[in-house]
Amino acid sequence: SVLAGKELSEIKTFFPIRKNIIRLMLNLPISFNSGTIIFYSLQKNINKDKDIFLLNLLGKVYEVKSEKFFDLITAIVGSGPAFFYYLLESMQKTAVSQGLNKIFSKQILKETFIGTSKIIENTESNFDDLRQSVTSKGGTTDAAITSLRKKEFAKLINNSVKDAIKKAKTLSSKK
């Protein structure tokens, strides 16, 4: 199942004969075999080579041991790409409003994002350390990060994730 907010016990009622039903949350990058796939199963002896091997073709597969995290996972994994798209969209609008060509601004934002993704993929550094490695005290990046902090950007992201969690709970009618 990839239904947001629907618990495995509820889904299982539609398939009473099936013993091994898994709950999935995945994201759009599966279209390019680069997705994040999270699964949970009531059956504890999942044979990953047999039962979920096809999922590995779509991206990285992770098992969670408790279904209680699925609303959070839905918000982060399922909605996560939209967060990044919205950030890029906002940066592009700013670039265009400051005089850059729309096509050119998309190209340089795309390459910046892809390059940044490759750094994340190829290092064990945490996000804070990576951000700090780009941020020179008193520099342009520092000014931008300071502005984001003053506007409580982290709190805005936190509240946005919580709103997505709340929506997932509403979809399952659980409070």
Region annotations inferred by a language model:
Residues S1-K6:
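ADP-ribose/adenylate-binding Rossmann-like module
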